[in-house]
Amino acid sequence: LVGKEIVRFHSIIWPAMLMSIKEPLPKKVLGHGWILLEGGKMSKSRGNVVDPVKLIERYGVDALKYFLLREYTFGQDGLFTNEVMLNRMNYDLANDLGNLVSRTVAMIEKYNDGIIPEIAESCDPDGDLEEIATGTASKVAAYMEEFSFSQALESIWTLIRRTNKYIDETMPWVLAKDEAKKDRLDTVLHNLAEAIRTVSILIYPFMHTTSTKIREQLGIADKPVVWTDSEKFVMLSGEKVEKKDPIFPRLDIEKEIEELEKMNGTKEKTPDYKEEISVDDFDKVDLR
């Protein structure tokens, strides 16, 4: 993996050097694009460099990895702005994923004493959710083979958004008011837990820390993450869930932008120059 500006060297000259000393050749050379700012390329002399370490310290490595892999097409240049990054974190991570996990675990705790129930009574929305959940792994794997990381993540988020819609369709809070609908409620809660378990596997190559946090809340942190398990939809029953702090707290965009501008700075640096001298003074200089 090299910058796109040095692909030629690493695909022609470097292999030739390796061949001359009979060393193994690289099987594939990948060139990544540039992350650009509104003023063009980042430059230390201009003082417009974004420090990834500071972003990780503030938002976590998983959030930054997700943004970079989801926002930019691998191999192409991409424009970076604080607004785009923060909105992506809020909408995708806090709203879609984080809220889904929090709501599901909270409902299992409230309506079934924190125990993931078995399937008892299925309806039409269940089959659609299961089909999307079990079919996502093959799509993600295919995109990964093509280094289409953004599309792979979009496939996972299609499942996440479908699961959020499933909550609105089934309305567990309404089912919980009618004891006669307990079997239906158990099935809904089970399906939600299964969908989240599936997500925890699918995001593992991209966001392993987040995956672990989700599995901890589902009570399966001690179980190995197996890719093929994402193609199954009946693996949970009897696990004790545990709600914890939000995986991705919602961000105040305006406040965060102010903090980021303080952290990174956006002013262009100019070199220091000495005061100019007159022609008469210059004539006095001995240049021998």
Regions found by a protein language model. Name each.
Residues 1-4, 21-27:
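NTP-dependent nucleotidyl-transfer catalytic core
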Residues 3-6, 44, 55-56, 85-96, ...:
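Secondary-structure capping and boundary motifs in well-ordered enzyme cores
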Residues 11-21:
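Short active-site loop/helix that positions an aromatic residue
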Residues 28-31, 215-217:
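Beta-strand segments within the central parallel beta-sheet cores of soluble alpha/beta enzyme folds
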Residues 33-127, 218-255:
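Catalytic adenosine-cofactor/nucleotide-binding cores of aminoacyl-tRNA synthetases and other
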Residues 77-82, 134-142:
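Short, charged/polar, low-complexity loop and linker segments
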Residues 101-140, 160-181:
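Conserved, charged catalytic cores of large soluble enzymes
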Residues 142, 147, 157-288:
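Basic, alpha-helical terminal appendages of large translation-related enzymes
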